[in-house]
């Protein structure tokens, strides 16, 4: 029962991601921008047909689709197995839940639409950050949390601890 309760985290992340994408697409189309905080934050819809930051866009669509599908399924099985394991620490489970929910959101986008919807657009002075989405945010925060967990308890993750001097 406790493991089922933990499924609420990735499910919630998935709902936030898909809901936010549906919301922004209800009033903006690809290439359109709505300024929220002038000179700092925009809603700017872009369709990422490549991998992270638009990489691998040069590959033919069929190869990209197969590659992303296999990589996504492998990651879901790997992280899902750790997430549901009885001995996974709660801190690690939070990070993994964020990663899983975000990966599912972007994966479903790619599976059903052939691209990932990105729309969060930040500008810092002359620096314009990549456009991203809610799923990307949760994946990043989840990876940081999971990484902290691995550093704090390397043997629990299956990683080999450094020898003591």
Go through each PLM region and give its residues.
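Alpha-helical transmembrane bundles and membrane-interface segments of multipass inner-membrane proteins
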Residues: 1-165
